[in-house]
Amino acid sequence: MNMGLLFALGDGDKVRALIDNGLLDGKLDKVKELSQKLTCAMQTLSKMASDNPGWQIVFSGGDDICIAIEELSYREEMIHTLMERFQELTGGTMSFGVGTSIENAYINLRRAKARGGNILITDPIPN
């Protein structure tokens, strides 16, 4: 566990199915359009997140983002803002898991996905 550090993992919901369907149907124009939207969205989300003091992008690409956040800088409403912006830019939803370790963040992301997506699940954040 990293004292004072939280991890936020975000992942677009059902993106793989959209890509698979486009490829299987031979609709490369749709896949290309989705890819461009995802690239733009992830660049935008990365900039939005990194503009917050204490927030650092660990990785961002495809429909995934990982953010290391100083505990005192964490704001749940900012995660919701990132989720809303992803939807505005792509038309799809995004789930997030936040945890006191990268493993916990990943588990919380998997929980959010298992519950249907478009959800933020967090560990209890220490005060």
Say what each PLM segment does.
Residues 1-127:
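Regulatory and interdomain segments flanking nucleotide-handling catalytic cores
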